Amino acid sequence: MIDLKLVQRQPEVLAKALADRHSGISVDAFLELDGRRRSLLTEVEGLKSKRNEASAQVAALKRSGQDAAPLLTELSSLSDRIKELDVETTQVKTDVENLLMSMPNIPDSTVPVGADENENVEVGRWGEPRQLDFEPRPHDDIGTALGGLDFERAARLTGSRFVVSLGWAARLERALVNFFLDRHTRHNDYLEVSPPYMVNRASMTGTAQLPKFEEDLFKLAEWDYFLIPTAEVPLTNLHAGEVLEESDLPRAYCAATPCFRSEAGSAGKDTRGIIRLHQFTKVEMVRFAHPEDSFNQLELMRGHACNLLELLELPHRVITLCTGDMGFAAAKTYDVEVWLPAQKTYREISSCSNCTDFQARRADIRFRPKGGKTAFVHTLNGSGLPTGRTIAAILENGQQKDGSVVLPKVLVPYMDGVESIEPR
């Protein structure tokens, strides 16, 4: 959430940010509404002061035996007017809060200004795609032919955009989760967490999935609970309403969880394979940082995601998202994209974002500087990594002419010595 004081004191800064993000929100309209809120509060306070004076006068008249009827009539009118204004004030305050909650985060000055993904900027690349002497097959064809991915049974069990993983595929998913968590906890100093897969409305609001993106979420019909779209939600909200010590920053958490997404608005996109599913497994990284250190932490987190792909021998590139393509809560985002030979392009496999104090302000997560007032922490999140898209990349990049798939060497110990998946 944007700082209201920033809106009031530097409206031109917010106006430019909203324009760069193509949000369509009018700062002038917001300031007019907020002005009405402040005017109402002033008017109500003035009327309450008059009511207090009138009450004192009524008491004095009654003590002296004089007629207080005219003042009682005035007192009644004042009370009625205050009640009317209280109702209007409550509504205007709600409108101000709702409009404030609908504003995206302010982009960092290093973020390129652009309208959409076509204006993102590549900032790094690792590895060279293999030169194949045969036409590469898509991962879903490979996985199905090798007996590991079953889309037909998943469709009968549930519906479209689901998959059943069997045998080596289920084992590979488990191996990836263990490999990712081992790297994060043993080498990158993350604390592993096993959080609930359902969260309440307050938690979803804290990380800014609500109220804007409710249609993208799965909600339990009889409860005000939501299935998590990412472990970012429970991990970030671990410290909701808390004050951390400055000496405890940065804090880093990771978790492997299923993620549930309705994929509203994705009709026709990635209808085949395991790139875009309603349910998938992902290891998430979340960091709480000092405001002066958060962009250093973003570079660190990006490095953690890229290192996993390097160890898996998967060619990839890093891009900085432009203002028009960033997520709602992000001040700066790096997307890491892995090479998929069958699509002859790079596809997103990790997104690492610095949300500055945007989520912390909504979830009320603060820290206590030495000798100073409490301040909001900066929150960061990143994929480290999703198993589905990683399996897709392994299948496509490791495919051989005979139909087999060579596994990355780093996974062999996690697969009990299995080095390749052979045709049945």
Curated annotation (Swiss-Prot):
Catalytic activity: tRNA(Ser) + L-serine + ATP = L-seryl-tRNA(Ser) + AMP + diphosphate + H(+); tRNA(Sec) + L-serine + ATP = L-seryl-tRNA(Sec) + AMP + diphosphate + H(+)
A Pfam family hit: Seryl_tRNA_N
Biological process per Gene Ontology, one example term: selenocysteine biosynthetic process
Pathway where this protein functions: Aminoacyl-tRNA biosynthesis; selenocysteinyl-tRNA(Sec) biosynthesis; L-seryl-tRNA(Sec) from L-serine and tRNA(Sec): step 1/1
Keyword Aminoacyl-tRNA synthetase: yes
Positions bound to L-serine: T230, A231, E232, E284, S383
Domain of life: Bacteria
Residues that, per the record, bind ATP: R261, S262, E263, E348, I349, S350, S351
GO cellular component, one term: cytoplasm
InterPro entries from the UniProt entry: aa-tRNA-synt_IIb (IPR002314), aa-tRNA-synth_II (IPR006195), aa-tRNA-synth_II/BPL/LPL (IPR045864), Ser-tRNA-ligase_type_1 (IPR002317), Ser-tRNA-synth_1_N (IPR015866), SerRS_1_N_sf (IPR042103), SerRS_core (IPR033729), tRNA-bd_arm (IPR010978)
Keywords: Aminoacyl-tRNA synthetase, ATP-binding, Cytoplasm, Ligase, Nucleotide-binding, Protein biosynthesis
EC number: 6.1.1.11
Subcellular location: Cytoplasm
Keyword Coiled coil: no
GO MF term set: ATP binding; serine-tRNA ligase activity
Oligomer and partners: Homodimer. The tRNA molecule binds across the dimer.
Job of this protein: Catalyzes the attachment of serine to tRNA(Ser). Is also able to aminoacylate tRNA(Sec) with serine, to form the misacylated tRNA L-seryl-tRNA(Sec), which will be further converted into selenocysteinyl-tRNA(Sec).
Domain remark text: Consists of two distinct domains, a catalytic core and a N-terminal extension that is involved in tRNA binding.
Family named by the database record: Belongs to the class-II aminoacyl-tRNA synthetase family. Type-1 seryl-tRNA synthetase subfamily.
Name of this protein: Serine--tRNA ligase
Gene: serS
